[in-house]
């Protein structure tokens, strides 16, 4: 009975792994994206003083999954805004300060440390950024994305104090 179980287990394992091995052999490097930290294509985020961004994968302006990195300079925070898509944020470097609501108030922000995660639900009003150190985030969303400022007259970014 034990021998039969072993044979069945090995057979099942082979059946599961064989297609994966064949798939790997057929797709060697096809579609993979590798970017080293020093090669990240940072650009100034349009309209956001003190913020840089880099599109890592996909295109936030088109339908489909996208991955973007955002870098806040020390002392820079966004003003209240929202996005049309859910966004999933992972803090890569620094402590990211996050607040919710229509009124910018850095004293009411909550820290998310490097390695931490936060979901921004579509349409949820929020503001975020850096206080005393540079912050780098990785954002994942489903395009088309965008940003709508709650108080456009206040600009997109400003001091975190």
Annotated model-derived regions:
Residues 9-20:
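Bacterial N-terminal signal peptides
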Residues 31-33, 107, 127-161:
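Double-stranded beta-helix
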Residues 73-76, 82-103:
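Glycine- and acidic-residue-biased ligand/ion/polar-headgroup-sensing regions
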Residues 78-80, 98-99, 120, 125-131:
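Short beta-strand His + acidic residue motifs that chelate non-heme Fe in jelly-roll/DSBH
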Residues 96, 102-123:
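Short acidic-glycine-tyrosine-enriched beta hairpin
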């Amino acid at each position: 009975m034990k021998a039969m179980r072993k044979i069945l287990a090995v057979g099942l394992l082979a059946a599961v792994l064989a297609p994966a091995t064949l798939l790997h052999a057929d797709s060697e490097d096809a579609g993979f994206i590798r970017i080293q930290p020093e090669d990240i294509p940072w650009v100034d985020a349009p309209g956001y003083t003190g913020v840089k961004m880099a599109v890592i994968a996909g295109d936030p302006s088109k339908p489909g999954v996208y991955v973007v990195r955002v870098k806040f300079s020390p002392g820079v925070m966004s003003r209240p805004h929202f996005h049309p898509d859910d966004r999933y944020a992972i803090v890569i470097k620094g402590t990211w300060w996050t607040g919710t609501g229509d009124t910018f108030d850095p004293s009411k922000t909550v820290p998310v440390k490097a390695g931490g995660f936060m979901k921004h639900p579509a349409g949820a009003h929020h503001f975020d950024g850096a206080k005393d150190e540079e912050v780098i985030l990785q954002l994942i969303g489903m395009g088309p994305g965008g940003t709508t400022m709650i108080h456009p007259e206040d600009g997109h970014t400003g001091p975190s104090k």
